[in-house]
Amino acid sequence: MVWSWVAMASRWGPLVGLAPRCLWLLGAVLLMDASARPANHSSTRERAANREENEILPPDHLNGVKLEMDGHLNRGFHQEVFLGKDLGGFEEDVEPRRSRRKLMVIFSKVDVNTDRKISAKEMQRWIMEKTAEHFQEAMEESKTHFRAVDPDGDGHVSWDEYKVKFLASKGHSEKEVADAIRLNEELKVDEETQEVLENLKDRWYQADSPPADLLLTEEEFLSFLHPEHSRGMLRFMVKEIVRDLGEAGSSLAGAPGPGDQRQGPGIAGKSGKVLREPQPGCGLIRSRLTDQDGDKQLSLPEFVSLPVGTVENQQGQDIDDNWVKDRKKEFEELIDSNHDGIVTAEELESYMDPMNEYNALNEAKQMIAVADENQNHHLEPEEVLKYSEFFTGSKLVDYARSVHEEF
């Protein structure tokens, strides 16, 4: 028996000694393969380019503003004006008790007179405070973005400086673009990029306060990125949203006001068709609202209209029905202030103004009405917790029991 084990050992011995050498060789081959394979930096470069583009492009979504740039209702509006800087802090995977406690802390801050009820006036004050937080956040971001497009640090950004940075974010060589602009040579860009550039330039003109010099200060650049910060740019934003895609001259904004008499490129859409789903960044190209009869005001059918023949199934029909229902409610209860069935430029501008105190009071009443189960025109802790999804975007379970826990 002993001799048999010795014989086996003598036969397997060379192979056992070979194992470490094989493993070493395999590791070396894998390392060489990894080294020879070209590193995939394209996704990294793409993410960096997208980040740069997003930083210098006016955003399609503005926190605390009722409409998106494409004319959609802002679905997150109520959470934005209720949570302010805490927006995004109530994800559903967060520990529920901690989220409920955080919500009750907010409740106590809104409830100024500590009667454990939130009145419309208290909610109005809170909405204005949270909107101011979004304004401050936008100002801080704009300062950072301004420095990115003001390479010489002279406190002014020219249209050409901005154009170079924008095209560089789209993948063009910054040096080649700068040289072409300096030599007044034609730039070769695709049709969509050209259309975005034309819209941006028109917006640049509008943000350039008189006397017009095509140079934006830091304050003007803020208005360029965030039109809600400027009365004139808010008016321009309304015009962009309701402009008829097929008719560049059909807009709800009416005649240009002082300082708007500048000649900029036209911004006509390629067709009058209203598209169902905009592509990313298309707030600068397409509009969702259309003044279909060109009378420079919006009727209810115009505000709720959707393209005919685009519903493919029952789910799509349900989406359309919800679209019409939501927009009809918004039109009748909030936008059409004199209830004559017509929305004028002034009414829409007032509705879009995030710092309008009258609007904030109306919104406060609307928000209370959603959760006011006992119909006392106030919000109580149980109601806020039960309707937590409306206020925070997250559904917090066991709301009734948690009231006693948190208080």
From Swiss-Prot:
Species, as recorded: Macaca fascicularis (Crab-eating macaque)
Entry comment, domain topic: Binds calcium via its EF-hands.
Signal peptide region: 1-35
Residue ranges, annotated region (Disordered): 249-282
Annotated GO biological process: calcium-ion regulated exocytosis
Protein name, as recorded: 45 kDa calcium-binding protein
Modified residues (Phosphothreonine): 193, 217, 310, 344
UniProt: Ca(2+) 1 binding residues: 111, 113, 115, 117, 122
Phosphoserine carried by residues: 99
Record field: compositional bias (Low complexity): 249-259
Purpose of the protein: May regulate calcium-dependent activities in the endoplasmic reticulum lumen or post-ER compartment.
Key words, A-Z: Calcium, Glycoprotein, Golgi apparatus, Metal-binding, Phosphoprotein, Repeat, Signal
Residues reported to bind Ca(2+) 3: 291, 293, 295, 297, 302
Binding-site list for Ca(2+) 2: 150, 152, 154, 156, 161
Sample GO molecular function, one term: calcium ion binding
Annotated S-S bridges: none
Protein location: Golgi apparatus lumen
EF-hand domain span: 98-133, 137-172, 291-313, 323-358, 359-394
Binding site for Ca(2+) 4: 336, 338, 340, 347
Record region (Necessary for intracellular retention in Golgi apparatus lumen): 354-407
Positions annotated to bind Ca(2+) 5: 372, 374, 376, 378, 383
